């Protein structure tokens, strides 16, 4: 419990003036050998109305002198006990340390406040549970090189400890200690210094790492694969966008190659690519362009690579198309199209492979990006026998109305060259026909046109089936048959002609067509090649 005197001492900031020495002593505000002691603000004290010190500095001085009363007062004024311990160590006042030892807690917390190596080591000794390794580790953390030098022989006897201290110094970025360990002791592995340098982008630490590495290579029979290590460092630096690190590595024999610049491309460090692009062979630049497409590099990087090749990429067109499709990276296609000179159109090549190998979604996305017409895609799909694509693209472009779909697909058939492609589109048309409600009188006109379309394209089975369906309507079937016979004769379609002949006979026996109409139809040039009129003569005899 505080006495009244202690409460006054704690809270008095301005002393009545003047007060004699005896009164100050009675108040406990007199420091022997220094004079009156007065608190100023929260953090400072005034000695003899003249000298100003921080409370903690005054506390250290009082503890060094062993002045317990002043120490007690300054602690009352919220001084830091750690400074009292430091002062006590400086003055070898172990009685004072013993008095406050229970309040100290962890002595390691005091170490950052100590500048003197001897006091640092004495403070560490206060903790009975610690060993030499603990001291050395804290010496590294707080940059106490002289302590390490003092225990050099002991460290040298423990190789594992040397490595531990070196790695700790790297993580703490204590360059002086790192250099001393590197030159004075034997280190098995130097990788930590480079790892930390990369992690913190610390060039000075990286340079120091190479200083120690070259020292190790030149003075020890070290089993170091230097070219491989340099290449690894270049790749790591390129991936991190650390150009200065790369230049430092090159000083020691590093070589910038495809793998290094690929790392820069992957992590979008265009400036590094720009710095070295003219130092690598043209063949390497082409490979980098292919990788940039694969990595979906941004526009500026692709333009940089293309311009370094003067946009002459014809020799790698197939590989470009392959990467564009496999990695959904179409930007390079757009850039090549934007050129006024040396323009290269890869749209058809990419679209052809998409239609052959990719999904409907990918194809539609590409169509949207490059304004590709559905007719173009459907023709490609027909050539590749991708019926599903024909149906899906058609419905997406023209809706789900049968007549609209058939109209557009018929037009495509007329302009399609490969017969296999025509057949597939005709198959699609017939599939739409079979799955629609066209067998009604209102659709008679459209069925009539579709039948003639089949006849024109020699679609025998489709023609035969639609004739059977059209006959059910009992509409202009005779007209259809006669017109289709003319088409068959003109285009030399014997199977269509035979189907027509069968229906003409049927119509004749039913009385739906006259002999004169038949003879007129069969009077066409070369008609006798396809039909035999003997059946008509036999019918007359009967």
From Swiss-Prot:
Q: Which Pfam families match?
A: DUF249
Q: Which residues cross the membrane?
A: none
The induction comment states: Expressed in the early phase of the viral replicative cycle.
Metal-binding as UniProt keyword? no
Keyword Hydrolase appears in the UniProt entry: no
UniProt-listed InterPro entries: MGF_505
Summary of the function given for this chain in its UniProt record:
Plays a role in virus cell tropism, and may be required for efficient virus replication in macrophages.
Protein name (Swiss-Prot/TrEMBL): Protein MGF 505-10R
| The species this protein was found in | African swine fever virus (strain Badajoz 1971 Vero-adapted) (Ba71V)
């Amino acid at each position: 419990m505080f006495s009244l005197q202690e409460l006054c001492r704690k809270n008095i900031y301005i002393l009545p003036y003047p007060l004699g020495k005896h009164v100050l002593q009675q108040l406990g505000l007199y420091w022997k050998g220094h004079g009156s002691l007065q608190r100023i603000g929260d953090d400072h004290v005034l000695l003899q109305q003249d000298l100003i010190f921080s409370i903690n500095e005054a506390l250290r001085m009082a503890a060094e002198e062993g002045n317990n009363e002043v120490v007690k007062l300054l602690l009352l004024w919220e001084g830091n006990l750690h400074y009292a311990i430091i002062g006590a160590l400086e003055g070898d006042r172990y009685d004072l340390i013993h008095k406050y030892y229970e309040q100290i807690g962890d002595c390691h917390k005091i170490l950052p406040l100590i500048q003197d190596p001897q006091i640092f080591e004495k403070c560490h000794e206060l903790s009975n549970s610690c060993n030499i390794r603990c001291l050395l580790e804290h010496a590294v953390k707080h940059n106490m090189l002289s302590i390490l030098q003092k225990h050099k022989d002991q460290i040298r006897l423990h190789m594992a400890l040397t490595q531990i201290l070196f790695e700790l110094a790297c993580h703490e970025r204590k360059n002086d200690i790192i250099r001393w360990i590197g030159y004075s002791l034997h280190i098995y592995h130097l990788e930590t210094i480079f790892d930390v340098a990369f992690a913190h982008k610390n060039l000075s630490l990286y340079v120091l790492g190479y200083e120690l590495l070259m020292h190790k290579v030149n003075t020890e029979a070290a089993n170091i694969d230097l070219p491989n290590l340099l290449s690894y460092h270049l790749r790591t630096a390129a991936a991190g966008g650390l150009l200065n690190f790369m230049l430092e590595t090159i000083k020691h024999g590093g070589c910038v190659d495809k793998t290094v610049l690929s790392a820069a491309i992957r992590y979008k460090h265009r400036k590094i690519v720009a710095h070295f692009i003219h130092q690598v062979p043209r063949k390497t630049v082409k490979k980098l362009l292919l990788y940039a497409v694969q990595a979906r590099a941004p526009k500026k990087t692709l333009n940089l690579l293309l311009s370094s090749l003067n946009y002459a990429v014809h020799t790698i067109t197939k590989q470009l198309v392959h990467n564009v499709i496999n990695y959904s990276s179409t930007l390079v296609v757009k850039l090549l199209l934007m050129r006024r000179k040396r323009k290269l159109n890869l749209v058809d090549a990419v679209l052809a492979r998409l239609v052959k190998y990719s999904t409907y979604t990918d194809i539609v996305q590409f169509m949207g990006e490059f304004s590709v017409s559905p007719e173009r895609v459907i023709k490609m799909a027909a050539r590749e026998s991708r019926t599903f694509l024909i149906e899906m693209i058609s419905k997406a472009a023209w809706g789900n109305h049968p007549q609209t779909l058939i109209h557009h697909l018929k037009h495509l058939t007329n302009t399609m060259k490969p017969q296999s492609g025509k057949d597939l589109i005709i198959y699609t048309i017939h599939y739409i026909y079979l799955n629609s409600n066209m067998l009604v009188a209102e659709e008679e006109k459209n069925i009539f046109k579709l039948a003639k379309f089949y006849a024109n394209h020699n679609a025998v089975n489709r023609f035969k089936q639609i004739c059977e369906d059209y006959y059910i309507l009992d509409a202009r079937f005779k007209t259809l048959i006669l017109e289709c016979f003319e088409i068959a004769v003109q285009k030399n379609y014997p199977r269509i002609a035979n189907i027509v002949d069968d229906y003409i006979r049927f119509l004749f026996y039913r009385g739906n067509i006259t002999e004169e109409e038949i003879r007129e139809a069969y009077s066409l040039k070369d008609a006798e090649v396809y039909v035999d009129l003997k059946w008509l003569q036999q019918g007359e005899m009967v």
